[in-house]
A protein has these predicted regions:
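Pyridoxal 5′-phosphate
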Residues: 1-170
Length: 170
């Protein structure tokens, strides 16, 4: 509340009115980083999960000039699915993995889809509608072993499972 009513300076500016908001943002960045095993400078603030997913998926695709493939699941959050549809329209092929009957994507399942042409794998950590929690560390290792980047939407996992981005490999 104080940053809406009294200390509303632009935290990105060098003037004195911006000092308190800038300090608050830095403290928030440090707090979040410590919760997920990241460095403060690795934390970026967006308007929410949808914008973050778009930054990750589309940003990677825009630098993927040779249009290599992306793999995701058929049961991702719509933010991821819509971002994948957008990159498909740009000529980037996307494969949609189907889960097993427990709504689970195994390492073996990803191994069946991934090739050395895969550029990005995106799998939601915890699905808020289905209740499934994916083995992100294992899936990330498969992606990295094939030279692919790995993205996970972990918004629904926060507070339910321990998250350490370095341990997970994301």
């Amino acid at each position: 509340k104080p940053y809406l009513l009294h200390e509303y300076g632009n935290a990105s500016q060098p003037y004195s009115f911006a000092r308190q908001p800038k300090k608050a943002i830095q403290e928030a960045r440090e707090s979040i980083a410590s919760c997920i095993g990241a460095l403060p400078e690795e934390i970026y603030f967006t308007s929410g999960g949808t914008e973050s997913d778009n930054w990750a998926i589309k940003g990677i695709a825009f630098q993927n000039y040779d249009h290599r493939a992306t793999i995701t699941t058929a049961f991702e959050h719509h933010a991821v699915l819509h971002a994948c549809e957008a990159i498909e329209r740009l000529g980037c092929p996307v494969a949609y993995m189907l889960p097993d009957k427990r709504v689970f994507v195994s390492r073996d399942s990803l191994e069946r889809y991934i090739t050395d042409e895969t550029f990005l794998v995106s799998v939601m950590y915890a699905n808020n509608e289905l209740g499934s929690i994916q083995p992100i560390k294992e899936l990330c290792k498969v992606a990295h072993d094939h030279g692919a980047l790995f993205h996970t939407d972990a918004v629904q996992a926060v507070g339910h499972v321990a998250i350490n981005v370095n341990d997970l490999g994301v």
